[in-house]
Amino acid sequence: MYRKKILTLLILVLPFIGFGQDMKITWEDNYGREFSIRAISGNFGYSMIPGDRISYNYDDTVSKIGNVYIRYNYDGTVSKIGDVYIRYNYDGTVSKVGGLRISYTYDGKVRSTSGRVR
């Protein structure tokens, strides 16, 4: 009975440990809009300032926030936000955001960063 409880606990906790290694990279433009991208998953986020309008592409992805254009790769990942380019490794993890380089360990966790986004 004791082993079943421990096994159940491990099954519930281990997925959260694995997903907890993602790093959020955040920067602002000159007007105060905040943009972010997650290093491992590549998820893109943003905030707006008063008066901003959002434009969408035909596939419902965001194409413009205020005066900032968002560009995508053919696979749907974000390639450019304003003047900040985003590069990816072959496994889909983010390798570079602007001038910020991201290094990973062999098991896919973020090891270090160097540089800065803008």
What are these regions (language model features)?
Residues 1-22:
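Bacterial Sec-dependent N-terminal signal peptides
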Residues 23-118:
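Repetitive, compositionally biased segments used for assembly/scaffolding
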